[in-house]
Amino acid sequence: MSSDLKQTPLYQNYVDRGAKIVEFGGWAMPVQFSSIKEEHNAARYEIGLFDVSHMGEIEVTGKDASQFVQYLLSNDTDNLTTSKALYTALCNEEGGVIDDLVIYKLADDNYLLVVNAANTEKDFNWILKHKEKFDVEVQNVSNQYGQLAIQGPKARDLINQLVDEDVTEMKMFEFKQGVKLFAANVILSQSGYTGEDGFEIYCNIDDTEKIWDGLLEYNVMPCGLGARDTLRLEAGLPLHGQDLTESITPYEGGIAFASKPLIDADFIGKSVLKDQKENGAPRRTVGLELLEKGIARTGYEVMDLDGNIIGEVTSGTQSPSSGKSIALAMIKRDEFEMGRELLVQVRKRQLKAKIVKKNQIDK
């Protein structure tokens, strides 16, 4: 493995725990600690802990910070409060998704954008390029933050025992600042990438290992990127670089809820997104279940039963929860019909599949 890969503060901790390390977005990350299935099931049915410190953090501050983040982002950032975050997209002029991200309003003039690891530098440069007309400062503060995700149906009860705040009523994307966890000061966000209840914990980078080790003392399973991918795919959650790209809009990529082109404020890509909201996008993302043995991989062709190509697989795996072969695929809008049978070209075979809901959590 290349020695110039970036490492999170927990890299040596993974190695000491015997994790299998892989390259991901320029980072050396654990793909698994025990087995992907064990880790998947821990987060789906019990409780699992992920190191997501490779994610990027970009801070926007200054007098025009609120207007600037609205200009950059496709969702309505007027809905933000200092306790309510927002999932949104950074779009180009054609409405394509440069990145999907979560934005936190830390104060009236201070916003934290949490972006995908592989896109941090690209996003940062895009944001800098567009700040000219705004009185703002933009900083890449990724090297100041550690980030952990504790996920699963038992995560809330554990966190409630460990922090100095009541988290029992926290709803999706609500967050609290200044929470004490193992004597460290953290931002606690009710969010995640698994389709389960849970929290994302933002801490000073120097506190990351203390919190990680502290949580693992409570019979919590460490989980790697392999389980993170199968969990998010079962939940129908998109991965940027596969299900979302700079040539896929929020309406095509299944995140229409993150686009609000009817608001008064202008933002980059608004005219294209307004047209797609009103008239429909040319393509749409669907869930697939393969009806024959095989795995639908990214880029595999999707055809109608006559063999006409109508789209392609964007992500696919075997579901550890159900054992079924599941996928997300991008198809022409007019070809969509729930339950419809299609074909997927898996190597030299054409396998039958059917259109199902994107969220395929089976428990």
From Swiss-Prot:
GO function terms (MF aspect): aminomethyltransferase activity; transaminase activity
Keyword Transferase: yes
EC number: 2.1.2.10
GO cellular component, one term: glycine cleavage complex
InterPro entries: GCS_T (IPR006223), GCS_T_bac (IPR022903), GCST_C (IPR013977), GCV_T_N (IPR006222), GcvT/YgfZ/DmdA (IPR028896), GcvT/YgfZ_C (IPR029043), TrmE/GcvT_dom1 (IPR027266)
A GO BP entry: glycine decarboxylation via glycine cleavage system
Keywords: Aminotransferase, Transferase
Catalytic activity reported: N(6)-[(R)-S(8)-aminomethyldihydrolipoyl]-L-lysyl-[protein] + (6S)-5,6,7,8-tetrahydrofolate = N(6)-[(R)-dihydrolipoyl]-L-lysyl-[protein] + (6R)-5,10-methylene-5,6,7,8-tetrahydrofolate + NH4(+)
Entry's family note: Belongs to the GcvT family.
Purpose: The glycine cleavage system catalyzes the degradation of glycine.
Subunit text: The glycine cleavage system is composed of four proteins: P, T, L and H.
NCBIfam families reported in the protein's UniProt record: gcvT, PRK00389.1
Name the record gives this protein: Aminomethyltransferase
Organism per entry: Staphylococcus aureus (strain bovine RF122 / ET3-1)
Gene: gcvT
